[in-house]
Amino acid sequence: MSSFHATTIFAVQHKGKSAMAGDGQVTFGQAVVMKHTAKKVRRLFGGKVLAGFAGSVADAFTLFEKFETKLEEYGGNLKRAAVELAKEWRSDKMLRQLEAMLIVMNKDSILLVSGTGEVIEPDDGILAIGSGGNYALSAGRALKTHAGDHLTARDIAKAALETAGEICVYTNDQITLEELE
């Protein structure tokens, strides 16, 4: 049975601000675009946390709910909530079946959370996941390195997603962009 997947999520911290962008394409199997305007980036915990997913849509919704519960349980402590989610995701027989990855961020931290138990904080304040993730990551790193005062975190996130959308067939130009200050 085919699943709904394929996307690009990009997140960056730059000059004291954080931005996350995701495209809107949902692909069924390897050949059919089912939706162009999906929202894969969300605000959680009263708007103080951004979360984006790549992978199975149904699995991602389950993980969003679990992560938000962990945020509430740990008083908004992003790192603790991410570690506890990763531990549960890896150890729970049912959750282990979920096929998705998350990027979560607040104004201070950005983390990749995976079902294999990884919680990774990048050295450079940039993360990207999904089918177009490597394209977005490359574009974002170049832009951040050479941006100086000319580009904001929002500008970098938007341009990185646009670049990925021009290259990756599973990424489109219907971008959802959220920013934290």
From Swiss-Prot:
Subcellular location: Cytoplasm
One GO biological process term: proteolysis involved in protein catabolic process
Residues binding Na(+): G165, C168, T171
Keyword Nucleus: no
Active site positions, chain numbering: S2
Pfam families, A to Z: Proteasome
Location (main, coarse): cytoplasm
Listed GO MF terms: metal ion binding; serine-type peptidase activity; threonine-type endopeptidase activity
Transmembrane segments: none
Subunit organization: A double ring-shaped homohexamer of ClpQ is capped on each side by a ring-shaped ClpY homohexamer. The assembly of the ClpQ/ClpY complex is dependent on binding of ATP.
Family from the record: Belongs to the peptidase T1B family. HslV subfamily.
The name this protein goes by in its record: ATP-dependent protease subunit ClpQ
Species the sequence originates in: Bacillus pumilus (strain SAFR-032)
